[in-house]
């Protein structure tokens, strides 16, 4: 064999078999940065149609986790695929830099502002901390192969962005959506601040559930219930409420009933004492069972509307409260009579406004009753629950008491229960100017992917309260407003003043506002107007980036095409962006919204340090490389929960090896191939080569379409299938003989090299958005194209167009002339699969060794036999056997193997003849040449003659 080795076209390439990407990628990143690859892409796409994917800013605190990695990789895949589709798709990464988590981290180091450190210095420390966090996260994102304007990201703490956030507030105020209100909001006693809807999470909590009697002294109330003459009953009359927040009873100012609900006056007995209780008719049985009352009967019935303004005695304070009507009252649970504390509940507040009820607010920002709260002063509200229960027992007002496990709002940061607390706050009104309906209209115009996202955000917008945008924090964008110190009215020049403040902030940052004396801006008006001390909700910061970033930066043109974040952002960034954009501009800030699920472990559990199941992006990139992490991200259906685990990543590494090995095979067989000199015209190509190019062309259309539809798992699936089935399992296997043994410059060899070159060019672009490092590595190993020039980077170009030309020519020359087209070769692929199974069985039976030591006979029906016969003697090359014979199905022996191909039976036998030393085919013509006694005639022609001719395979 050694004598003839030099006559073979053996593969050779510098493209390594082992990726070793964990070590290779960092050097590639350094080179890309030195070459300003992102800038080169921008230059190449200048003037092209724009596609804007706006980056939702992660919070600048802590290391990135797998969820961050998934999010940024998905965005990167989209941006890279859009650039390859010849869009100008810049990507500007952002960070959310203000807010409580950063304050808390800084407090741990320097103390609270106003104590050991001034508010001004505290803000500077927050700015420095956020900058450090941004730098750390930026390096982590770069390591993932994310292409972005890393040198000029947007930060919500950039002076220019802070100024534009203030301008956004001005625009919303100018459009009439801003108002000040005294209203119950979710309040975290640990934060000492109100929370946005998106900052509230619901967790199970055990609370004291109590039924409380509010005594009614007016005996005539019994007459409102239709009872027989003389049967008014006996004992004290009382309306019974049910609540799980006993601590709110000091703020009770009414009992709400539903006007349309029927109520019963129930005669009952408790501890030998007769009493008459008012309860919704539908709940009487349930309530009596809960109270443990055996003896009871109905005295009479009336509608809730009959009870309006009946006065009830507060259970432990010396005043009465009215019965009011509220549509929010139902008979789903409780008693049908609802405890109403306007300072501690949104529905209570709304009803309270209708009846001009006092908005009692006896609870301080720290969750402790104020000093003037009778009986409970100085107690924390949650600890006071027990005190309230004891008070009710003393007063004889406690009807029943038990512990209840239920879902309750908690702070997403502290994981502690929240309270509703009425405070003076600034709101964006959802209804005053029709913002709710306008937002719903814009939601309908937007494309939501998956489509259930639309209904989700619609229901949230339909039910959400006014957006409380004020916070009582130190590190945040100020609400640059002046209000009258007595009336609270906004300064008449508020819109102009906001712009003046914005100009100052643009130069010096938010500290400019806090340093500003009112007199400097409003002159003598400072005697009557004061600065609003509040800062803006951080969701306002990020929610207005469509204005403060997209409209402010030169590389963006128009509104964003796409927002892409986790599914929790329907109630977060997607909603805050929609509401603020509609409030400012009357239109949605995006055309499409795409969501991904959360990352969970292999068992479906959320990743957490306490469970010990956390996998960090750094672990994966250090061990396997970023391309494996990127492949995993692309291969899953990211619209659902995304499963991660060591075994899962190992499987991705196996899949990666398949793609890499296929690419290496293509490259290693292009040694010495110069497209400018060696490309074979499509009409001169071997039929099988024409087919595989056509297959690749069709596949490219499907892959580009999958990228356009954001279905990256489809891209990976199709790429893997192509590498495994059409290439690895069929085409590349078949052409090895021709590639290695044919005359080096023969049409037979150059034809398959042409096909491999075109496929390699196309495949490199297909994988570039996902396997970015590997694609560039392949790109650098490809031969120069026909033009003789190649862009330095695959990312500055477009999808390969050589396949499309091949496909169009084949359509004309092949399909229409009844040659061997896609359908034919697809059927041959199936036949070959059956032959392979038969050969495998023969190997197990030890009747043959390797496939080339076998001859196969195909017993086929007339139609199938005619198709197979089209290949003539070249059928054996497709089946990779030394001989292939076609016989009629009627001549099949009894031991012929029936296949899954209709009308096909097979027999396998040892091939007759001697094994050729060069090509390893077993033939009967070996020894006929004195010069090459160990070679077959075909190999002799390929060495000394003009070379064999291949027409089909």
UniProtKB/Swiss-Prot annotation:
UniProt-listed InterPro entries: aa-tRNA-synth_I_CS, aa-tRNA-synth_Ia, Anticodon_Ile_BEm, Ile-tRNA-ligase, Ile-tRNA-ligase_type1, Ile-tRNA_ligase, M/V/L/I-tRNA-synth_anticd-bd, Rossmann-like_a/b/a_fold
Keyword field: Aminoacyl-tRNA synthetase, ATP-binding, Cytoplasm, Ligase, Metal-binding, Nucleotide-binding, Protein biosynthesis, Zinc
Major subcellular location class: cytoplasm
Cofactor: Zn(2+)
Gene Ontology MF annotations: aminoacyl-tRNA deacylase activity; ATP binding; isoleucine-tRNA ligase activity; tRNA binding; zinc ion binding
Motif ('HIGH' region) on chain: 58-68
Residues at which ATP binds: 609
EC number: 6.1.1.5
Example of a GO cellular component annotation carried by this entry: cytosol
Domain of life: Bacteria
Disulphide bridges, residue numbers: none
Places the protein is found: Cytoplasm
Binding site residues for L-isoleucyl-5'-AMP: 565
GO terms (BP aspect): isoleucyl-tRNA aminoacylation
Summary of subunit composition and partner proteins: Monomer.
Alphabetized HAMAP family for the sequence: Ile_tRNA_synth_type1
Similarity comment: Belongs to the class-I aminoacyl-tRNA synthetase family. IleS type 1 subfamily.
Function: Catalyzes the attachment of isoleucine to tRNA(Ile). As IleRS can inadvertently accommodate and process structurally similar amino acids such as valine, to avoid such errors it has two additional distinct tRNA(Ile)-dependent editing activities. One activity is designated as 'pretransfer' editing and involves the hydrolysis of activated Val-AMP. The other activity is designated 'posttransfer' editing and involves deacylation of mischarged Val-tRNA(Ile).
Domain notes: IleRS has two distinct active sites: one for aminoacylation and one for editing. The misactivated valine is translocated from the active site to the editing site, which sterically excludes the correctly activated isoleucine. The single editing site contains two valyl binding pockets, one specific for each substrate (Val-AMP or Val-tRNA(Ile)).
Name the UniProt record assigns to this protein: Isoleucine--tRNA ligase
Record organism: Colwellia psychrerythraea (strain 34H / ATCC BAA-681)
Gene symbol of the encoding locus: ileS
